[in-house]
Amino acid sequence: LEYGIPEFRLPKDKVVAAEIASVKALGVKIETNVIAGRTVTIDSLLDEEGFAAVFVGSGAGLPRFMNIPGEHYNGVFSANEFLTRNNLMKAYRSDYDTPIHAGKKVVVVGGGNVAMDAARTALRLGAETTIVYRRTEKELPARAEEVHHAKEEGIQFAMLTNPVEVI
């Protein structure tokens, strides 16, 4: 909640902080930076620590790369990395002088909700933003309302297009 979801969709200081406080008020113990199976086992939490239940929140999955030349150049990020950097460095706040790198023109490859979030975030950082997707608009996996908002905000779409190299 803190890192991958843009501020414009989920205000951290208001919504996330209040949700965490309400969960803690219910008596839930939150442990972060724990690697299940390494630093602690599920069995030890249930048997030795006396927990009645364990929730494993594994976070977002690993990004999928296209295996094309140039995709590991400086300034090329996975959408999750870009969103995390933006949130951690509070680039969405005008009173912060955040050194996040977003070029004057940004291309986001993909058509899911995370791609829409990354594109809309880049737009808010002042970039002319285009979403490139290999299929038709009807086949976009993002929710229709996310696509609508992206278009409404001025994001361009290049459909039936797939990059072969980053130059």
Each model region followed by its residue ranges:
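Short glycine-enriched, charge-decorated loop/helix-capping segments at active-site entrances
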Residues: 4-10
